[in-house]
Each structure stands twice: as C-alpha cells, then as structure tokens.
Amino acid sequence: YRRHVLDCLDVIPPAISLVILSGQTGTAKTHILQAASKNGAQIVDLESLACHRGSLLGSEPDKPQPSQRLFESRLCQSLKNCDPQQHVFIEAESNKIGNIHVPPALWAAMRAAQSIRVTAPMTARVNFLQRDYAHMTQNPAVIMPLLSKLKHRHSAAQLAEWDALINRQDWPPFIESL
C-alpha cells in the first residue's frame, strides 16, 4: 500500500492542471477554495489534510496533525479523485505545513502552476483574522508561547509590544503588526 501511495504522489501531481490561490494571510483563501468546491470546482485542501493553517499560529485547536504517512495517504486519495482534464485549485503553501512536508512532486507542480492572487485591504484582513482565529483571541495564553518562536526574527522590543497588546486584548493592532 505504501508503495502505491508514494507512486501516486510522484505520478499524479505533474499530470494535473493546478491553479494556485495565493495571497497574504487573512485574504480568506481557504474559504474561497471551499466555496469553489461547493460550486463544482476540483480542489485539494492541503490545510485540511494537514490539520494546520500553515502559519506559526496555524495549529488547529483539539485537532492534532496526522502523521506524515497518513497525510500522504489522504493526499493520494484526494489527488486520485481529480479529473486530469479539469483544473485543480490549491492554496499556495510553503513546502512544510506545520510538521507536515508537501511531497516533492506536488511542491514542484505547485511552483510551476499558474496562480491567482487574492487581495484584500488591511482592515478587511484584520477583521477576517480576528474572526477566524477567535479560538486564540478568546484564550490569549495560547499565543505567547507561539510568538516566542519568533524571537530570532524580531526584537525584544517587538515581542514586548505584542505581549502588551495581548495583555490588553487589543487585537486589531496586534493582528496588523503580525
């Protein structure tokens, strides 16, 4: 079975016509992908398969990530369900979604695919993220340990500012700053 999954992940991605939804965080790409699916479009939802939203704060509450092998089995099934004569929409991701690695053939196909860029004004993105990540804003203690992972990329002053915004639950400037 494992050999079948690995073959599937090598053979199918180059054979399908991927269209990438790209854009900044908070432009509702996943929601657009899901709406496209409801309207008959073929999609591969990597974030759903990986149980992770792809960002530092992307872990799903009460939903651990699957093993790499289980992710790959689910991905293989999702790819096998695609008609190669039709476009397949997929959200732009890095080659790692949380602890899950996107298989090399799919990653290469994604990098070569045509792309649709989704844009939204900053205020709309902030409002969307505040709603979509309500599980974090309702439990701020979850956020700081995650932000500490950014200490090598941001100054102590920036981390202190984020800490103050979190403590005041002043979400719009915190979200915009991230």
Per-region residue spans from a language model:
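Glycine-rich phosphate-binding P-loop
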Residues: 1, 17-38
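Short, acidic/turn-prone active-site loops that include or flank metal/cofactor-
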Residues: 1, 48-51, 121-122
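Extreme N-terminal, non-catalytic leader segments
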Residues: 1-17
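Short, charged, surface-exposed secondary-structure boundary motifs
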Residues: 3-7, 53-58, 125-128
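A general structural motif
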Residues: 16, 85-86, 112-113
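Hydrophobic/aromatic beta-strand patches that form the interior of the parallel beta-sheet core
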Residues: 19-21, 42-44, 90, 114-118
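Conserved nucleotide-sensing/catalytic segment adjacent to the nucleotide-binding pocket
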Residues: 38-109
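Conserved NTP phosphate-binding and transfer environment spanning the P-loop NTPase/kinase superfamily
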Residues: 108-115, 119-178
